[in-house]
A protein has these predicted regions:
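Adenine nucleotide-associated cytosolic modules
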Residues: 1-179
């Protein structure tokens, strides 16, 4: 309601459901860009596989304690999440935000950068973070940019989109391709 008051031309769709393999394709189909703030690896891989299949860019943001990261995964123009993280780390190395703690302002910093990257994609402005990772370290108040290249062993690509089976993922988050 607040957004409609600010700009009546903006349509907001809400989904009161958990994103899973049974609904993800219907929910994300037709969007120009997806903003990802998922806090777990199975959801990130599920979103990656669906967005790769549909050719939709994803503005990814993640946080951990005092650090954050933002990247744009564009299946038609650059690397994807599976290129950056082919396999999830062991559970003991990836505690939840509740277990590890997160600096309270960090989601706002990362979210603001994601909003900027989303606008850059939608308006075709500037140089987006496709093929790059922006790392934020709030303990040093430093920002670093790293290059990200496609992993030649990654089989979840837009070229293979007809073989990608979007499924709920187990703890291994292994890709599902039909033969």
């Amino acid at each position: 309601q607040t957004i409609a008051k600010l700009n009546p031309d903006v349509k907001v769709n809400t989904y009161d459901t958990r994103l899973d393999a049974s609904n993800i394709m219907d929910i994300i189909a037709g969007y120009d860009v997806i903003v990802d703030g998922a806090d777990n690896f199975p959801s990130r891989y599920l979103l990656n596989d669906a967005s790769v299949k549909l050719g939709i860019p994803v503005v990814h943001g993640s946080i951990f304690r005092f650090e954050g990261m933002v990247s744009v995964f564009h299946p038609l123009r650059g690397p994807t999440y599976r290129d950056m993280v082919p396999e999830p780390p062991p559970a003991e190395l990836a505690p939840s935000c509740a277990e590890a703690g997160v600096l309270g302002v960090l989601p706002g910093i990362v979210g603001s950068i994601q909003a900027l990257e989303t606008l850059k994609i939608l308006l075709d402005l500037g140089d987006s973070l496709i093929g790059r990772i922006l790392s934020v370290d709030t303990t040093e108040m430093s920002f670093r940019v790293f290059k990200l290249r496609a992993d030649p062993s990654n089989v979840v690509t837009h070229e293979n989109r007809d073989r990608i089976e979007v499924r709920d993922l187990d703890g291994l988050c292994a890709p599902w391709l039909s033969h």
